[in-house]
């Protein structure tokens, strides 16, 4: 559902603008969609960002993989390592990629265990929220939206697009949706 949608959006966007897919979930399951990676991953880039003797910008290109029209950096494999990344580090990572690499759009496939989730959502120009037509799923979506409001992040809902999952979507509709990801308020392209 959600990951497949994010990857398809990455494919569509990458046809017209340099786009990078990042999976920020504790348990990404990305090896279902992409080849198993035993090499370096997003955790290595975060490590390089902390080292004064290593320029992390040079490492970005060595960490990029490409599959089915999507550029991506393999996600952090160990969930405990993922949980140790702070919201400041996530923000520094996004800034580094957007300011120092070729990528103009980053597709974030977010899970609820990422530190600073609401801050990351706040940076996005569009937030796609998938859901299924099922009672418990709707209750979870309503609870998520209420949590955003009560935590002072209600503005995120104004740029949220709900996407019903379960039935294959029309590729033309997906392309039209993908084209709506445009500008970050300060003029930089972000997602």
Segments from the language model and where they lie:
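Conserved catalytic-core segment of NTP-binding enzymes
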Residues: 92-184
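Walker A (P-loop) phosphate-binding motif
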Residues: 1-22
């Amino acid at each position: 559902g959600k990951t497949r949608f994010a990857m398809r959006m990455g494919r569509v966007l990458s046809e017209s603008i340099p786009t990078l897919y990042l999976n920020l979930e504790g348990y990404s399951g990305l090896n279902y969609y992409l080849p198993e990676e035993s090499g370096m991953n997003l955790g290595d880039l975060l490590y390089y960002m902390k080292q004064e003797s290593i320029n992390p910008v040079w490492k970005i290109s060595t960490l990029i993989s490409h599959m089915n029209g999507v550029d991506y950096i393999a996600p952090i494999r160990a969930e405990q390592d993922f949980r140790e990344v702070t919201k400041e580090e996530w923000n520094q990572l996004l800034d580094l990629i957007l300011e120092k690499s070729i990528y103009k759009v980053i597709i974030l496939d977010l899970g609820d265990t990422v530190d600073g989730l609401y801050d990351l959502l706040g940076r996005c120009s569009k937030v796609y929220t998938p859901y299924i037509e099922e009672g418990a799923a709707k209750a979870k979506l309503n609870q998520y939206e209420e949590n955003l409001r009560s935590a002072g992040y209600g503005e995120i809902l104004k740029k949220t697009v709900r996407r019903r999952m379960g039935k294959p979507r029309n590729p033309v509709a997906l392309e039209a949706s993908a084209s709506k990801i445009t500008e970050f308020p300060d003029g930089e392209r972000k997602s």
